[in-house]
């Protein structure tokens, strides 16, 4: 397989019509019949909650999927690099750096 020049893949056809072409089938100006209508020319900024998404739309469960189905699992492995350097040389160097920092801080504070 040539990774620099992969074979072409045909994109699958869209399972639904484009979003912008649908017209609302409900009355928009007074969509809540129990409440009085808003002022003339008023349009709500966002429609109310319409329930669950239809099957086939993004984020909707498949039509024949059981309700008790587990969510998809993505396995993530976390690897930590830990130094196991317990030599005396390393301990001496750490002590020297600590003493140097303390001396510098003491000089700055006094």
From Swiss-Prot:
Keywords: Membrane, Transmembrane, Transmembrane helix
GO cellular component: membrane
Biased composition (Pro residues): 1-18
InterPro entries: CYSTM1-like
Major site of localization recorded for this protein: membrane
Topological type in the membrane: Single-pass membrane protein
Intracellular or extracellular location(s): Membrane
Domain of life: Eukaryota
Record field: compositional bias (Low complexity): 19-29
Family: Belongs to the CYSTM1 family.
Name the UniProt record assigns to this protein: Cysteine-rich and transmembrane domain-containing protein 1
Taxonomic placement: Eukaryota, Metazoa, Chordata, Craniata, Vertebrata
Encoding gene, per UniProt annotation: cystm1
